[in-house]
């Protein structure tokens, strides 16, 4: 676990764990991930070595069901279940509508909550398309609990693994929804991938109670 895939608190960023598992399953099964869900169980700290064991439960003509157990020694860090494959169909529809936001060049850079030059947070070019800068939080909730970022990943092409990383920006969305910084940890993340296209990260938060949060990232 290196600084570049860790949080500022020196543990593996949850989205990077799910992304690594997605990449491992796609490599082992030679099929694209269409759905994956991760259960986060423990922390992997910088400097530790995390192994990923891929188990292919069922492999059919068009669909594979597999899972990954990620562990540091005997300590399990996360478990990921996934479906992989594709089935040609004569239909191509999308019912999720992208929000109307300014183009990336017209949006300000997303400011950092804390100065940072080495964690996962430093590896993206993020533009705040809809939301409030950290230093302007005043307790005013975001309309409809919605915020949006333009995100450029200069080091990697867009992929299911990259979407898994971006999908873990729940603390950003929760804080935007309430207009205040609310630290939180991931219990589980789920991604569904229809077709990989250049897209924005649009975060909507429909539920928060007693520190259990539901958030989703449409458009993947």
Q: Over which residues does each language-model region extend?
A:
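Terminal targeting signals and extreme-terminal segments of soluble enzymes
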Residues: 1-220
């Amino acid at each position: 676990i290196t600084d570049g895939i860790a949080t500022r608190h020196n543990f593996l960023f949850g989205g990077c764990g799910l992304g690594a598992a997605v990449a491992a399953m796609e490599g082992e099964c030679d099929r694209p991930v269409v759905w994956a869900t991760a259960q986060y169980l423990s922390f992997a700290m910088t400097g530790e070595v995390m192994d990923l064991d891929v188990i292919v439960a069922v492999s059919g003509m068009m669909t594979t069901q597999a899972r990954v157990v990620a562990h540091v020694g005997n300590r399990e860090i996360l478990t990921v279940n996934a479906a992989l494959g594709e089935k040609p169909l004569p239909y191509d529809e999308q019912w999720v509508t992208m929000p109307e936001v300014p183009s990336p060049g017209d949006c300000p850079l997303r400011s950092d909550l804390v100065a940072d030059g080495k964690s996962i947070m430093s590896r993206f070019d993020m533009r705040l398309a809809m939301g409030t800068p950290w230093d302007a939080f005043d307790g005013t909730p975001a309309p409809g609990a919605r915020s949006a970022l333009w995100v450029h990943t200069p080091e990697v092409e867009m992929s299911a693994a990259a979407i898994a990383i971006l999908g873990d920006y729940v603390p950003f969305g929760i804080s935007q929804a309430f207009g205040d910084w609310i630290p939180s940890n991931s219990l589980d993340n789920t991604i569904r991938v229809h077709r990989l296209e250049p897209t924005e990260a649009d975060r909507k938060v429909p539920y928060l109670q007693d520190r259990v949060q539901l958030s989703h990232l449409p458009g993947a």
